[in-house]
């Protein structure tokens, strides 16, 4: 699963997701992509589940790029613990997604296969997505 090797701070504040994503909003590496059209938080496990689903569909053909990385820690206190006594320990890692962000990209497969694979991967993710193609000028 994806997780950062080192971080500057072990714990972070929650914050909130506002606005659209300008960076990473177009298909840069592959021919087809899966683009977020709603905001949310995607865990490393959800990214891995989507990756496995895509790879099962394309088998040995094609190349996959994961354009998001879970670099933000989510903390959790142990079960049946009283309130207070500080913030809990980091439990898992998330990526914050804003509308417009390209999550996955594919190349080396036909459009029908890519559309099917990315559609199945979208079921594994907690954000609404759409299928996009690379803009060739």
Curated annotation (Swiss-Prot):
Pfam families: Ribosomal_L16. Gene3D superfamilies: Ribosomal protein L10e/L16 (3.90.1170.10). GO terms for biological process: translation. Keywords: Ribonucleoprotein, Ribosomal protein, RNA-binding, rRNA-binding, tRNA-binding. GO terms for molecular function: rRNA binding; structural constituent of ribosome; tRNA binding. One of its GO terms (cellular component) is cytosolic large ribosomal subunit. The keyword Nucleotidyltransferase does not apply. Part of the 50S ribosomal subunit. Belongs to the universal ribosomal protein uL16 family. Binds 23S rRNA and is also seen to make contacts with the A and possibly P site tRNAs. This is Large ribosomal subunit protein uL16. The gene is rplP.
